[in-house]
Amino acid sequence: MAKSALHLARMSYQPKMPASLQGAVKIIEGKATEAVSDKEEIAAIFPRTYGLPLISFAPGGERTEYPPTNVGVILSGGQAPGGHNVIAGLFDEMKLLNPDSRLFGFLMGPDGLIEHKYRELTAEVIDEYRNTGGFDMIGSGRTKLDKPEQFEAGLEILRELDIKALVIIGGDDSNTNACILAEYYASIDAGIQVIGCPKTIDGDLKNKQIETSFGFDTAAKVYSELIGNIQRDCNSARKYWHFIKLMGRSASHITLECALQTHPNICIVSEEVEANNYYLDDVVTYIAETVVRRSEAGMNFGTVLIPEGLIEFLPAMKRLIKELNEFLSQNDAEFKLIKRSAQRQYIKNKLSPENSRLYDSLPVDVARQLIADRDPHGNVQVSLIATEKLLADMTAQKLAEWAEEGRFQGRFSTLTHFFGYEGRCAMPSNFDANYCYCLGRAASILIAAGKTGYMAAIKNTADPVSEWEAGGVPMTMMMNMERRSGKMKPVIRKALVDMDGEPYRALREMRREWALSTEYVYPGPIQFFGPEHVCDSPTMTLRLEKNDR
């Protein structure tokens, strides 16, 4: 492939590692663990992988002869910067433990395992992708891996290739499936270990043991650069309000982090909206009031950051979406027979009275998007809902009403943006390059230790890399029971913005000042070379959360 000058320079970057991942490693097992909630139900579903101990690595173990081990790897779900470095770290540690070990990448996500499509990942292949963005080394996919017939189809190719361990790199849903697969293979004594690695730019796969998911650092910095560019333009022209929607279907971590980096005039946090039982009109009124106050100070411009999943956090909308999800999952075949022109009336007649009235009141585009095709996990595809345009239009309408009443004499012109794909395959920051490489090395060590049902984990990530701690976390420890597609299922719990956490508190303390003044920060592009405080610094979220731990 053709390479840019920066690409060539990044290929030679050697990721940093803590001492616990260098040389001989000692495995330290902690106490038995239990699920975050619904303990009895989770224990019953995962009898062979429940209650496993936490694992930490320490330097100074005895050098051991390891047999050659063939390993498979899958990239699952949406892309996130750093996935290639997870594979590179996995490969390098495998070869260090035994040069005769082999790594196979299943193509286009779980489908590659099920359909027996793969490629061997040699040093020549992997060296082309070190420190690069994207998942194009082997591709990714969103197929759910949760059925016994899929597990058996995968087992055929695993046995054919003499693969003893499978690494699944993905988000909470993908690692939930990895946990189910680990339990299934253990239940039939298949001799296949399953290890997970935490990936999602949304930042919603984290807990006390998993401090961050890879890709979040890079994506937040990419979006923050773009927001900073827009804010500089905004402060130069001084005639537009920019409504900017950011990735984050289930949580507002990206929006919050970008706000901390760029100081917008308004930052909507979905979790705050839900906690205060706000309605859509409450959010619109808050934005409009800020527009009025800035206009009175001679500032007919500003920026609004909006999380992708806001609609799902509005309590009334949440109830509507829940009923829609359950109804459509149970009546999918019948719904598909309804003409598109008649679908809205059909849905309205099937909903409860309260939800029917709300659904009928929605703009045509939003109502249509709520019943559009679901993702493979049965969820409304909220990224298709143009929340940024909806809020901009509703704010304009409210301001027009206020103007007629004499409450607003300013100007209000809007531009809308959605930053999503721009950050998914960016060249990983130094933080993500280091973090992902360490995750891959940790996954390989867990395999060598004979573990299954674990997720590779790195702690102390707000500190310099030399102080990071590596290990493994039982995936059942993160599980709870949730309703999915109308049924209660075990899933890894998503991490929402903590309303008592330091990152949110920092926003809350500054948001009024940001709203009434113009204190934009312009982060600029990700830096790969130069002083460590410029190139290697973690996110504001990680640094602030360090105070909570």
UniProtKB/Swiss-Prot annotation:
Mg(2+) binds at D172. Its EC number is 2.7.1.90. It catalyses: beta-D-fructose 6-phosphate + diphosphate = beta-D-fructose 1,6-bisphosphate + phosphate + H(+). GO terms for molecular function: 6-phosphofructokinase activity; ATP binding; diphosphate-fructose-6-phosphate 1-phosphotransferase activity; metal ion binding. Its main location: cytoplasm. The record marks K199 as: Important for catalytic activity. The active site is at D202 (proton acceptor). InterPro entries: ATP_PFK (IPR022953), PfpB_PPi_PFK (IPR011183), Phosphofructokinase_dom (IPR000023), PKF_sf (IPR035966). One of its GO terms (cellular component) is cytosol. Homodimer. This is Pyrophosphate--fructose 6-phosphate 1-phosphotransferase. It comes from Porphyromonas gingivalis (Bacteroides gingivalis).
